[in-house]
Amino acid sequence: DALTSAYGYPPTTITGSVEKDIVMIPPMIGVKVAVSDHRSSNPSGDDLIALATAARRAGLLSGTPGLVTMHMGSGKGRLDPVFYVLDHSDVPAKNLLPTHMLRTPELMDAGVELVKRGGYIDCTAGSDDQAVEDQAVKLFDLLHRNGMNMDHVTMSSDAFGSQPRFNAEGECVGLTYASPKYLHKTI
């Protein structure tokens, strides 16, 4: 399975349209965008409604999930844009999949609220031995919170995705990639 676009909004597509990409290119099951992250293009709630509506329509036509997979950063907005979509549109929570949900305690809290509202969240496995241990502890905490539906929580490796390293000033000082081996270690 694949996603069209990347972090930016408006989305960059192959056919010129999120809907066409999902309907006409068989591996496509949805679209990717970054939210609440210093690397995102800061899509508004209305931008996400338009994106989610397009992905959902295409999913209905193609028999795919029609997901909006959201790279979540540690920004101030947290899941506010996602809750905006749920509060101001008819897009079902199941079409919205925020990732990297163990990034901050506040994001984890918001993830619990999203799951309580019928949504799904994805947690990222560690990217080295210490991070594996840290992520496993966070995941255990998240899964044992009151009202948490474990069937609505997934874990992925971010395998071979770029992994920037930042210094204390927030400057990118290196780039590497995540290995898939840490998914098994985290679980």
Language-model-detected regions and their locations in the chain:
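Metal-associated gating/positioning segment near the N- to mid-region
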Residues: 1-4
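Residue-level signal for short, function-critical loop segments
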Residues: 127
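Histidine/acidic residue-rich metal-binding segments in metalloenzymes
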Residues: 13-123, 131-152, 184
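Acidic, glycine-rich active-site loops and adjacent beta-strand->loop/helix elements
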Residues: 6-10
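His/Asp/Glu-enriched, well-ordered alpha-helical/loop segment
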Residues: 145-187
